[in-house]
Amino acid sequence: MKYLSLRFVPGLLACVLFAGVAWATGLPFSIVHYGNFQRMMHTGDASGQVMLAALPQQPGTWGVGATAGLNGEIVQIDGRLLVSPGSDANGRVRPPQADEQAVLFASGRVQEWRDVAVPRDMDSTAFEAFVQTQAKALGLTLEQPFVFRVEGRFPHLLWHVLTGQKGAGSGHGAHASHGTGHANSRSDMRLFRQPGASGQLIGIYSGAVLEGVVSHPGERFHLHFADSDATVSGHVDRYSVAAGAVLKLPVR
């Protein structure tokens, strides 16, 4: 299926919104998603899939994504949408502009969290296994998507903001696999290395249902970092989590 563009036919907005609701049918925690990682990588089509103004913005809604044209990142914190434009050299966030669109976006709404202390320092592989183990213990199925968070300190942290510039390997496949360290210095993204940073990771776990759709193909985790004051944010490429951090899993 080709991507829908909202730039020229305002009437298509209702169709896109209807499609988004249809995609969310049967998914837990009011998960909605727009765009498709794998399809975008194959086609190179980075056109807008939904107006940011049309996204759910109720309190308790958390999400991640990228702007149309791959020229910025999106994070949603407790209902508040924030954009990190690729034009900002420091990765700072701002409110969405009136006509801004997302090429990729996924969010879920959580009314109650279960806090789980991280017992030791963990690299990304160990932490993601920990998330899955704790989610299963809470009664969540690993086949279905859910939103989660982790608050604390990150001894190793590399994140980026896409700039929309064309470069070798550009495209949201350039949203590098965060566990394997594919990110490097390129014209199509701004890289930020912040070892020891404090703040939170906002994540979407794809489950089998949405793997390759809301996450990088072959992965089930899509993570964005936001500092403690939510002044900077971007897509996480590599990270570790310090002992004492708090994993927040959705209950309802």
PLM region descriptions:
Residues 2-12:
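Bacterial N-terminal signal peptides that target proteins for export
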Residues 10-20:
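Bacterial N-terminal signal peptides
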Residues 22-24:
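Boundary at the C-terminal end of the N-terminal hydrophobic targeting segment
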Residues 39-103:
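N-terminal low-complexity or amphipathic/hydrophobic leaders
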Residues 83-146:
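Contiguous hydrophobic, core-forming segments of folded domains
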Residues 124-201:
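Long, positively charged binding patches that form subdomain-scale interaction surfaces
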Residues 186-217, 226:
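Functional cores of ribonucleases/endoribonucleases
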Residues 224-252:
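C-terminal structured interaction module
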